[in-house]
Each structure stands twice: as C-alpha cells, then as structure tokens.
C-alpha cells in the first residue's frame, strides 16, 4: 500500500498519536519505538548526525502531551549492550554502562515527575489551549490539560499565545519548567484570558521548556518551589 507518512512529517510523532487517538473505539496509545539516543539519523550511515538528548526530549514530550500514556526511551549502545570486544551496529562504540550517563537517558525522569505531579487520569490533549497560529515542525507547541491545570511544551522557545480560560479559576499561577534538569521558575499570577509567553533564554532549536499554568486555588506546585518532587 501507500507509505502512510506524509513527506517531511516523519519526525512529527505527535501526528501519529493524534491519528491513533481519533480511532474508534479509542484505545491507549504509546510511541513504542521513537528515535534512539546516539543513533545516526539515517540509521545505517554512521557518518550522519546522531540523535541527541534534545531530540529525545522532543519526541517524548510531543508524544505524551499529544495523548500517549507513557513513552519508550532507547539508546544505541544500551539496546545492543555494547562493551569492549563486542562490536555493534549503527556506529555504536560507547559501552552500554557508560551510556547510562548520557543526558537524554537521565532527563526522562523529569517528564515522569511532571506528569505525576498533576491529576493523571483527567489529563487530555487539547490544542485549543494554543491561541492564534501555531508553528510548523520544530516550532509546533503541544498542549495538554486537566480540569484545573494546563501545560504547553515549546521546543524552540518561540513566542506563543496561551488561552488560560481553558481551565478553571479566575486567577492562574504560571511557571516555566526546564526539561533538561527539572527546575521550576515561577512567572507570576495572571487573570483569565489569552497571554503571550516566550522564555527569557530566547529562540533556538532544542531550547525547550514547558509552560505550566494552574488554577490559583490549587496547590499542586508551590510558588517557592524550584524543583518538582521525584515520583518513584
């Protein structure tokens, strides 16, 4: 049959999650094999660029915010259990136990901690949270929300407009969440309506953050909190 993925959308794994979520009857969705950290873009040509931690984060947050119930992480060396004296495919040379120190591997826990900080089973994907025009490819913002909280993942740090009226509460508290280290930065309290945001670090690919907005009557996150608690 025809190739099911439109040209130039191969990296947009949020599209595949949305497509699966729209099927009837609805079933749980997960991206079972996204990219692998430190594997070549073209897979078989080890001279191509390697997928890095920022790519791993993009695939993970896009997928989960679009509706996946979890995420699958992979590493080129770990999946092959590369070690001295044992050759591997796809240009893998790093021993698997050294790969356990790679950044993408160690940053996945920050996504888990974020998701489990808020009511998990009421959370839904909701792109109507994004007001105005959304971006294409890496500039696309992906939104998810519960009844009294919302989150928007922004991979490039581009300016975006967010509609606070999509959740409960006349007043809202907002934070930036850094996906690289799980750090929180309180932005302030806001009235309802549409508000424009851009992280102070500016625009660049891989400069990714999550905007968190919460009904001010809720205390999922404290204003003076600088790190979301670990959820085992």
Task: Kindly label every feature range from the protein language model.
Residues 1-60:
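Substrate-binding/catalytic cleft of secreted carbohydrate-active enzymes
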Residues 17, 198-200:
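Short, P/G- and charge-enriched loop/turn segments at secondary-structure junctions
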Residues 25-28, 37-39, 54-188, 200-231:
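Aromatic- and carboxylate-lined catalytic core of secreted/periplasmic carbohydrate-active enzymes
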């Amino acid at each position: 049959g025809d190739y099911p993925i439109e040209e130039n959308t191969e990296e947009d794994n949020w599209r595949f999650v949305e497509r699966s979520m729209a099927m009837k009857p609805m079933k749980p969705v997960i991206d079972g094999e996204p990219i692998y950290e430190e594997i070549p873009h073209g897979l078989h040509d080890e001279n191509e660029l390697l997928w890095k931690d920022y790519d791993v984060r993009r695939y993970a947050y896009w997928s989960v915010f679009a509706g996946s119930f979890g995420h699958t992480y992979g590493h080129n060396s770990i999946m092959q259990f590369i070690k001295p004296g044992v050759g591997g495919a796809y240009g893998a040379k790093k021993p698997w136990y050294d790969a356990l120190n790679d950044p993408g591997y160690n940053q996945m826990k920050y996504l888990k901690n974020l998701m489990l900080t808020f009511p998990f089973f009421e959370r839904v994907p909701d792109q109507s949270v994004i007001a105005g025009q959304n971006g294409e490819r890496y500039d696309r913002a992906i939104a998810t929300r519960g009844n009294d909280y919302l989150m928007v993942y922004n991979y490039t740090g581009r300016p975006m407009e967010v509609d606070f009226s999509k959740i409960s509460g006349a007043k809202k508290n907002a934070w930036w969440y850094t996906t690289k280290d799980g750090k929180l930065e309180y932005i302030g309290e806001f009235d309802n309506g549409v508000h424009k945001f851009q992280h102070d670090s500016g625009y660049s690919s891989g400069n990714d953050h999550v905007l968190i907005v919460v009904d001010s009557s809720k205390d999922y996150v404290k204003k003076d909190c600088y790190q979301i608690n670990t959820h085992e």
